[in-house]
């Protein structure tokens, strides 16, 4: 991501986001993880809307965040492609078996950026809950030796009622069980984070009552 372009976006978009992306930020443990990201990290979240990236860009204002973006969004039109390139987005084709995007994500982390991944892989339909997580974010965080920051957004953009919940940062290696195979560990850790994000959603919904 071009840091000058990132800051240009944040400065020019700061006032508009106060209205459309207005939100309340909730912390699981503010001492462990707050809105300031002190080291490169993998941010994961449920997926509600194309504006999810925007809300995290302004929530973690100090960080340079590069999102993982599906081909249907990245290639939507020339303007979108231009923005995605300058925001440092990594394109992934969900219908192919090309995993080179993971190397690109690791490179982003190695150069001091944070990355944003939506492990559901797509935006759920209205009648669907949180979709099963895909494990690519675990491989990336493990290889780059960076923490994962689980988050949740209610996605009620434009209403002023959005809630963003920030969980504690977690290192993948801290969740490994030496008695299990690599595949078993990855599956268990993926389910762990899926359930963690669900709990963040419960916190967000409880806060709305």
Write out the residue ranges for each language-model feature:
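Short, glycine/polar-rich helix-capping loops at beta-to-alpha or helix-loop-helix junctions
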Residues: 9, 75-79, 159
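Non-catalytic C-terminal accessory region of glycerolipid acyltransferases
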Residues: 4, 101-209
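Helix-enriched interaction subdomains in cytosolic or periplasmic regions
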Residues: 1-16
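A generic local structural motif
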Residues: 23-31, 53-54, 102-104, 135
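A generic structural signal for alpha->beta connector loops
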Residues: 22, 62-64, 86, 112, ...
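Catalytic core of membrane glycerolipid acyltransferases/transacylases, capturing the structured
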Residues: 35-96
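Helix-to-loop junction immediately C-terminal to a conserved catalytic motif
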Residues: 13-47
């Amino acid at each position: 991501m071009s840091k000058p372009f990132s800051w240009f976006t944040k400065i020019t978009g700061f006032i508009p986001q106060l209205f459309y992306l207005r939100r309340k930020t909730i912390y699981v443990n503010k001492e462990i993880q707050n809105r300031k990201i002190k080291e490169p990290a993998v941010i994961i979240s449920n997926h509600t809307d194309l504006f999810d990236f925007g809300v995290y860009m302004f929530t973690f204002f100090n960080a340079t965040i590069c999102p993982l973006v599906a081909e249907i969004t990245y290639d939507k039109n020339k303007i979108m492609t231009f923005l995605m390139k300058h925001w440092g987005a990594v394109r992934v084709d969900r219908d192919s078996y090309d995993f080179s995007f993971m190397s690109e994500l690791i490179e982003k982390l190695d150069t001091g950026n944070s990355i944003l991944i939506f492990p559901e892989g797509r935006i759920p339909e209205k009648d669907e809950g949180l979709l099963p997580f895909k494990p690519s974010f675990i491989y990336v965080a493990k290889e780059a030796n960076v923490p994962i920051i689980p988050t949740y957004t209610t996605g009620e953009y434009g209403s002023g009622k959005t809630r963003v919940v920030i969980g504690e940062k977690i290192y993948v290696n801290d969740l490994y069980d030496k008695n299990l195979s690599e595949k078993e560990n990855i599956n268990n850790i993926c389910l762990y984070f899926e359930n963690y994000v669900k709990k963040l959603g419960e916190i967000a919904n409880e806060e709305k009552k």
